[in-house]
């Protein structure tokens, strides 16, 4: 079932090694192809050789327009968050449906820690004026989470160069 795949995959995702990364990518690709009708239709349209894809670099990426015109989900779930693009092109914004914010936060936090260290060790400054003025930004969500986990007293958002928001 989709639920058992998600549970098993999540556990392995956060304990994976560099050696198992490619295998996890291919497994997730196969899952998305089987359980996301929009992604499957796109792969079929471009004649992606599904059974021959063995390396993560060969996995087809959906064009950004698909995120604007379709509700991209694998299976059925109520999203805990729906992030949207800034719409800088003046067109419809793209949307990202997040089923589980705990997994989402763990993912970007562990990614940060892999390269830098724990956010507690940093002063996190968010100077993102055009983003602060809109709702639904995944960047604001991630920076806010990093600020909350930082132990530095001057961490925070700044609307303009010196104004703390």
Task: Go through the PLM ranges and name each one.
Residues 1-84, 90-120, 126:
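Nucleotide 5′-phosphate-binding alpha/beta core
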Residues 27, 124, 131-165:
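Conserved adenylate-forming
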């Amino acid at each position: 079932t989709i639920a058992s795949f998600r549970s098993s995959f999540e556990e392995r995702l956060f304990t994976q090694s560099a050696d198992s990364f490619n295998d996890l990518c291919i497994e997730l690709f196969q899952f998305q192809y089987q359980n996301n009708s929009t992604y499957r239709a796109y792969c079929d349209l471009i004649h992606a050789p599904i059974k021959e894809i063995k390396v993560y670099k060969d996995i087809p990426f959906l064009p950004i327009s698909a995120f604007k015109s379709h509700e991209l989900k694998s299976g059925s779930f109520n999203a805990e968050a729906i992030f949207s693009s800034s719409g800088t092109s003046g067109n419809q914004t793209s949307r990202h449906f997040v089923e589980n914010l705990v997994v989402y936060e763990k993912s970007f936090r562990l990614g940060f820690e892999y390269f830098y260290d724990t956010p507690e060790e940093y002063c996190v400054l968010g100077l993102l004026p055009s983003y602060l003025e809109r709702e639904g930004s995944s960047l604001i969500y991630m920076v806010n989470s990093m600020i909350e986990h930082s132990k530095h007293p001057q961490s925070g958002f700044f609307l303009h160069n010196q104004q703390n928001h």
